Regions:
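Rossmann-like AdoMet/SAM-dependent catalytic core
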Residues: 3-63, 67-70, 77, 113-114, ...
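Conserved SAM-binding loop of SAM-dependent methyltransferases across substrates and taxa
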Residues: 76-88
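Short, polar loop motifs at secondary-structure junctions
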Residues: 95-103
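Short, conserved active-site loop motifs that form the nucleotide-linked donor/cofactor pocket
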Residues: 109-110, 142
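Conserved acidic residues
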Residues: 115-119, 147
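Switch II (G3) loop of P-loop NTPases
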Residues: 144-151
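Conserved beta-strand signature within the Rossmann-like core of class I S-adenosyl-L-methionine
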Residues: 166-177
Length: 269
């Protein structure tokens, strides 16, 4: 069993039996974090890139002069990458995933590496810094789209603020968010969010409805287990207002097998 499958196995085990591995977090600390993550409406409208269901994400329509997309955890779905190639002339797409043999699509703009993204570089993993340094010398802006099954936290914590600032738009699927109720997990997860919030702001959130155990209720709050977050770098935001209603008109369920999971009110009100 590889590292990713082992991580997923224990995550599902914790969810199934609702195991609490540390003391519970102070509710005020949790509310403060969620307040920082509430999405805003900016001067850039949101557009849907990718498939109608899984693999499609809402991002700001601010795509001029972006040179590269870095997309770790591609698996067997690459509709997001395909769509961006059509929309951005000359875009180069760098894909990575150790769990598959090849890129799910073939295109002259696609470059695939059989590696996982992580906090170290070895025969199976590389860091975001090492990957970008190897693949591009461009000084223009980049896009990051990351779905790496829980490894997103260590990657963000390990990545320098200067490097994160290279990405104009960042899309990340965050996992195990129901563990925000646990003190130890809260410190780890909140550290990753606080890192990215130094340079970016949240412009969209969409819960993933494919997870069997959709959320944990904690002192009046609902914590969806897996959610897709879209971030826009702060210097691209000229004006912004609060978002008063979800879902967005362009949101679609990740799987058609069940109804979409609507973002709970406290995450945006």
């Amino acid at each position: 069993m590889n590292i990713r499958k082992l991580n997923k196995f224990f995550t599902n085990l914790f969810l199934k039996f609702n195991i609490v591995t540390s003391k519970t977090v102070d509710i005020n600390k949790l509310k403060l974090l969620i307040n920082l993550l509430k999405p805003i409406k900016t001067n850039h409208k949101l557009i849907r890139i990718g498939g109608k269901n899984d693999g499609g994400y809402l991002i700001p329509d601010d795509l001029e002069n972006i040179d590269c997309l870095f997309s770790p955890g591609v698996s067997d779905v690459a509709s997001f990458e395909q769509d961006l190639i059509k929309r951005i002339k000359g875009l180069r797409c760098f894909l990575a995933d150790f769990s598959v043999q090849n890129s799910p699509i073939k295109h002259k703009s696609i470059n695939f590496e059989k590696k996982f993204l992580g906090s170290i570089s070895n025969e199976k993993f590389f860091t975001l810094k090492d990957w970008i340094t190897k693949k591009t010398k461009s000084k223009n802006d980049l896009i990051l789209q990351m779905d790496i099954e829980g490894f997103e936290y260590e990657v963000l914590i390990n990545t320098e603020e200067k490097l994160l600032n290279r990405f104009r738009i960042i899309v990340i699927e965050f996992h195990n968010l129901e563990k925000l109720t646990e003190e130890f997990a809260f410190k780890f997860i909140s550290a990753a969010f606080e890192k990215i919030l130094k340079t970016h702001m949240v412009v969209h959130i969409h819960p993933n409805n494919t997870v069997k155990h959709l959320c944990r209720k904690y002192k009046g709050l609902e914590l969806p287990s897996v959610m897709e977050f879209t971030f826009l770098r702060k210097d691209r935001i000229k004006t912004f207002t609060k978002i008063e209603r979800f879902p967005h008109i362009l949101d679609r369920p990740c799987t058609k097998k069940r109804a979409d999971f609507i973002l709970p009110d406290f995450w945006y009100h």
